[in-house]
Amino acid sequence: MPKLEMMLLVLLILPLSSFSAAGEQVVQGDQRSDGLARYLQRGGRDVQECQVVTPGSKWGRCCLNRVCGPMCCPASHCYCIYHRGRGHGCSC
C-alpha cells in the first residue's frame, strides 16, 4: 500500500478530536488521569491558610492539599500525614 493511501486510511480511522488545531496529537485521558493532572497542577494552593470549621476540631477546611485533600490541620505546627489503615490525620 503506498504511503499516501496508508496516511488517508490512518486519518479515517483516528477521530478528529484526537488532534489539536496545530496538528499535534492530543491525549484524552480517563477521569483518573484527569484527576492526576489536576493534582499535579495545584501545588500553589498548599500555602493557603486553613479555616477552622469548629472550635476544638482537629480538622479545618482549606485548599486542596496534596496529602489531606480538602481538609488540613488548623494549627501551624501540625502537618497532614497518612496512617495506613486509618486514613489521613494531623500530626502535631
Swiss-Prot record:
Annotated propeptide span(s): 25-45
Molecular functions per Gene Ontology: acetylcholine receptor inhibitor activity; ion channel regulator activity; toxin activity
Keywords tagged on the record: Acetylcholine receptor inhibiting toxin, Disulfide bond, Gamma-carboxyglutamic acid, Hydroxylation, Ion channel impairing toxin, Neurotoxin, Postsynaptic neurotoxin, Secreted, Signal, Toxin
Keyword Aminoacyl-tRNA synthetase appears in the UniProt entry: no
GO CC term, one of those recorded: extracellular region
Known tissue expression: Expressed by the venom duct.
Keyword Zinc: no
Signal peptide: 1-24
Modified residues (4-hydroxyproline): P55
Subcellular location: Secreted
Domain of life: Eukaryota
Chain positions with 4-carboxyglutamate modification: E49
Main location: secreted
SS bond list: C63-C72, C68-C80, C73-C90, C78-C92
Function of the molecule: Alpha-conotoxins act on postsynaptic membranes, they bind to the nicotinic acetylcholine receptors (nAChR) and thus inhibit them. Through its two C-terminal domains, this homodimeric protein would bind to two nAChR allosteric sites, located outside the nAChR C-loop of the principal binding face and at the adjacent binding interface in a clockwise direction. This toxin specifically blocks mammalian neuronal nAChR of the alpha-7/CHRNA7, alpha-3-beta-2/CHRNA3-CHRNB2 and alpha-4-beta-2/CHRNA4-CHRNB2 subtypes.
The record's note on its domains: The cysteine framework is XX (C-CC-C-CC-C-C-C-C).
Assembly: Hetero-, homo- or pseudo-homodimer (identical sequence, different post-translational modifications).
Name used for this protein in its record: Alpha-conotoxin-like Mi20.2
Protein source organism: Conus miles (Soldier cone)
